[in-house]
């Protein structure tokens, strides 16, 4: 078993019309034993940028704390929030810096850039970025997430339809992966509001 599969995870981000959604499962396990059913994988960096971290839970929390620290330093120095592209480059640089003893995480970054244009990307544990215009996935359920997202995604969805699509994709995918699941956590972000919703799925 890969160390990336030790705790289990599923994270997905999807682009809509001037909005994006990012979702994750809520299970924290140690291989097949469930430890917690309300684990937070998605974090808000500021109102227009979110990050979801799949992988080893200890490294997820350590990396998140470092990212918050670096973003606050940037805010103090520049007196503004980071753009999503800048934040993605920061995450990539932090991961690459530790490439010989890497953080065992695979981040998914989603944000709204200039002119409310949505930006999503994912990267591997040493910071190699993968940009996309439709959706990105990571975690132990990524194979089934790819299939579900390919089947359900369509461009320029409004916020409510995007929520429905990402939720169905997440819930149907975690049912096919025994290391992730126990409901879902979804954020839908538009230029004017942030909606947070908890999904109830199969509780086994």
Curated annotation (Swiss-Prot):
Keywords: Cytoplasm, Nucleus, Proteasome. It is found in: Cytoplasm; Nucleus. GO terms for biological process: proteasome-mediated ubiquitin-dependent protein catabolic process. SUPFAM superfamilies: N-terminal nucleophile aminohydrolases (Ntn hydrolases). The keyword Membrane does not apply. InterPro entries: Ntn_hydrolases_N, Proteasome_beta_3, Proteasome_bsu_CS, Proteasome_sua/b, Proteasome_suB-type. GO terms for cellular component: nucleus; plant-type vacuole; proteasome complex; proteasome core complex, beta-subunit complex; secretory vesicle. Gene3D superfamilies: Glutamine Phosphoribosylpyrophosphate, subunit 1, domain 1 (3.60.20.10). The keyword Nucleus applies. Coiled coil: none annotated. Non-catalytic component of the proteasome, a multicatalytic proteinase complex which is characterized by its ability to cleave peptides with Arg, Phe, Tyr, Leu, and Glu adjacent to the leaving group at neutral or slightly basic pH. The proteasome has an ATP-dependent proteolytic activity. Component of the 20S core complex of the 26S proteasome. The 26S proteasome is composed of a core protease (CP), known as the 20S proteasome, capped at one or both ends by the 19S regulatory particle (RP/PA700). The 20S proteasome core is composed of 28 subunits that are arranged in four stacked rings, resulting in a barrel-shaped structure. The two end rings are each formed by seven alpha subunits, and the two central rings are each formed by seven beta subunits. The catalytic chamber with the active sites is on the inside of the barrel. Belongs to the peptidase T1B family. This is Proteasome subunit beta type-3-A. The gene is PBC1.
């Amino acid at each position: 078993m890969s160390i990336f599969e030790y705790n289990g995870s599923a994270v997905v981000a999807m682009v809509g019309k001037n909005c994006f959604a990012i979702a994750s499962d809520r299970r924290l396990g140690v291989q097949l034993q469930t430890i917690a059913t309300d684990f937070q994988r998605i974090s808000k960096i500021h109102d227009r940028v979110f990050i979801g971290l799949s992988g080893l839970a200890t490294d997820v929390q350590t990396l998140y704390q470092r990212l918050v620290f670096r973003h606050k330093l940037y805010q103090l120095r520049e007196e503004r929030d980071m753009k999503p592209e800048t934040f993605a480059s920061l995450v990539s640089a932090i991961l690459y810096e530790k490439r010989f003893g890497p953080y065992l995480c695979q981040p998914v970054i989603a944000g709204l850039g200039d002119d409310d244009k949505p930006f999503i990307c994912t990267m591997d544990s040493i910071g190699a970025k993968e940009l996309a215009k439709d959706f990105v996935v990571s975690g132990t359920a990524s194979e089934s997430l790819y299939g579900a997202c390919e089947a359900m995604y369509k461009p320029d969805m409004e916020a409510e339809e995007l929520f429905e699509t990402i939720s169905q994709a997440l819930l149907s995918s975690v049912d096919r992966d025994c290391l992730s699941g126990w409901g879902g956590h979804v954020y839908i972000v538009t230029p004017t509001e942030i909606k947070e919703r908890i999904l109830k799925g199969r509780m086994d």
